């Protein structure tokens, strides 16, 4: 069962009545309560809807139960605001008495709630939030990330841009907060180590309405622009890029969230040819994704997105972990360690397993926006298999460097 609050009403998922001795014991222990928070209002509302829908699709397919216990999902709207996210997590834990919490979009929210779940020893899953240091320099024992670290997909793009796209002089224009910094920083580091130069770095506020001043200030001697955007900002920036005449003159590449399916549907021909990197594409050609994408579109009448598949995967992690401990989620440490041990060979995203710090090792896909059958899609043009959050670097040496931020790596070629 999924319970929403406020205007979101009550949504029921299919629940099968378990039978047999194991089911009876599960019933005696009561339902497993999962607190799920997502931005169901504000600029990232569509993202939040995709998250909830992907999460609930898995539980519907699983019959609303695992290990003989029913699963109850309690949903909260955190409005895409980090402080609100912390408030909602506290409510889920202290009022709703959930066994575990999951959700969130913005990396800043991930950093905001981490101290609370750590202090209160709450098994927590980050299906989407990508703050690097949650699984790097400041690992949080009680958090398992089933998504990816913010720079995990941009390291490969730095390699691809130089070696395969032939780009040499780049600028960046990204959202001015931790995900933008970390994602762009990963790209810059690998691109420059490959021999390229980032000659300008621009940052835009999350409430930006007019990209004109930023685009007008772009250097004229660049052959490409790297951008990190998400949500409604992606559509706003893509239109501005075309309106200012850059399309076809300067290569546009970036984080996969920039052309994710949940925003791509609102774009037009201005998006054609844009190359991005991500852990997923709705048109990935593997049996698990074909099943998932078809089921998602059939149920919700829209294409699967990064956020829907990430949440679907998170639910799968819960299912496998809870099954492995025979439903004993009351033993929090056992539950947490079971989550960390999950390996999935047939996820829609491809094979996944956790590293020692609780972050997936998984494929990163280079995608190009094309129109196929009258519909825009992220066609996979290259695959980097089994990518670690540390790329090809030695883990211990990598962790000695500073966290990617607004000023690191420094812009050595800016003048």
Model-derived regions, located:
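Hydrophobic h-region of N-terminal signal peptides that target proteins for export
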Residues: 14-22
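Extracytosolic ligand-binding ectodomains
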Residues: 3, 8-13, 25-415
């Amino acid at each position: 069962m999924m319970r929403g609050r406020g205007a979101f009403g009550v949504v029921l998922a299919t629940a099968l009545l378990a039978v047999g001795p194991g089911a009876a014991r599960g019933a005696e222990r009561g339902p497993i309560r999962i607190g799920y928070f997502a931005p169901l209002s504000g600029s990232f509302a569509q993202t939040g809807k995709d998250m909830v829908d992907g999460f609930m699709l898995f539980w519907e397919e699983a019959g609303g139960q695992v290990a003989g216990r029913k699963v109850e999902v309690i949903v909260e709207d955190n409005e895409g605001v980090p402080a609100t996210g912390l408030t909602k997590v506290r409510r889920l834990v202290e009022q709703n008495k959930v066994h575990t919490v999951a959700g969130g979009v913005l990396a800043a929210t991930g950093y905001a709630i981490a101290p609370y779940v750590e202090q209160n020893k709450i098994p927590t899953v980050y299906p989407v939030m990508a703050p690097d240091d949650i699984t790097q320099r400041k690992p949080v024992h009680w958090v398992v990330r089933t998504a990816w670290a913010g720079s995990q997909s941009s390291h490969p793009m730095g390699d691809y841009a130089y070696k395969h796209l032939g780009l040499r002089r780049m600028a960046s224009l990204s959202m001015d907060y931790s995900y933008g910094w970390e994602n762009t920083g990963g790209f810059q580091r690998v691109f420059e180590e490959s021999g390229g130069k980032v000659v300008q770095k621009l940052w835009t506020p999350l409430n930006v309405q007019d990209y004109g001043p930023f685009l007008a200030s772009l250097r004229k001697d660049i052959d490409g622009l790297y951008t990190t955007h998400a949500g409604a900002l992606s559509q706003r920036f893509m239109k501005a890029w075309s309106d200012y005449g850059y399309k076809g003159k300067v290569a546009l590449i970036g984080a996969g969230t920039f052309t994710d399916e949940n925003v791509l549907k609102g774009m037009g021909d201005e998006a054609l040819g844009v190359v991005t990197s991500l852990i997923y594409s709705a048109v990935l050609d593997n049996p698990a994704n074909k099943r998932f994408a078809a089921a998602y579109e059939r149920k919700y009448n829209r294409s699967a997105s990064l956020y829907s598949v990430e949440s679907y995967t998170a639910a799968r992690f819960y299912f496998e972990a809870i099954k492995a401990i025979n439903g004993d989620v009351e033993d929090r440490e056992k539950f947490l360690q079971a989550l960390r041990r999950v390996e999935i060979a047939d996820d829609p995203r491809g094979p996944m397993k956790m590293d020692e710090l609780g972050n997936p090792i998984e494929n990163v896909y280079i995608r190009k926006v094309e129109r196929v059958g009258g519909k825009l899609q992220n066609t996979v043009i290259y695959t980097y298999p089994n990518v670690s959050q540390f790329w090809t670097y030695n883990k211990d040496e990598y962790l000695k460097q500073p966290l990617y931020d607004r000023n690191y790596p420094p812009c050595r070629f800016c003048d």
